[in-house]
Amino acid sequence: MGKKVQLVIWIIIAIVAILLIGVVGYNLVLNQTEEVVHPEVTFELENYGNVKIELYPEYAPNTVTNFIKLVEKGYYNNKVVYGKDDICMYVGRDQEGNAINPTLGLIDDSIEAGTDADYEYTISGEFVANGYQKNTLRHEKGVISLIRNDYTQYVQTLTEESYNSGNAQLGIMMSDNSSTLNGVYTAFGRVTEGMEVLEKIYNEVAIKEPETAEDGSTTTSESDIQAFSAYPVIKSATVDTHGIDYGMPKTEKAFDYSSYLYNLMSSYYSDTNQ
């Protein structure tokens, strides 16, 4: 009787082992054959060529969704490459150097333009310093990152407002020496074609970013405007989502830094005059 029980137990163990091997083998085959499809955006840079960008929703899903929606709505058409520094090239201002913040009415057809609901919006920064742990994409050459404001250089307490101030302007990494951006800016894509186009612009075109005032506005002289008119223009921006609907991004009303400063100064002078 004991031998029969042992035999049954061994048979059960053998069956379970075979099933486990089958499941593990199936998962290995599935992982090897299942291709991850990423959305792709193409910028047609007038007189220069095309740049293709692969997007990574697994790292920054809301940033990717917002970028896709802006491309679909034509936001980047006729915008320019407007600035560069030692590690990065900047994209997304108009041909007079103005940063045109998108409004909800642009991306949401249910919102009527010019109404109270059609306000300028921003999105939450998807990076470690902002409490988001899933974005491990590093700022390396060719990586695309979302530009945001840094109000803390003027008011140190405005960290949260700074982290969540990005919406549309982009930084394209032109160097691997950009590790200082890791964890404090949202990287969400990478150039897969046309890097030579960007390098030509970066190395040969004299691009001067307009100066930014303390309230976040830009000051451009007539000569600056003339210079901007000669900067590389995005003739068109298109997106291929491979049939996937990424929906609408989660947004928040843009922080009004100018009003904040005005109220801060008014409160200060009111207190000093009492």
What are these regions (language model features)?
Residues M1-Q274:
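Cyclophilin-like peptidyl-prolyl cis-trans isomerases
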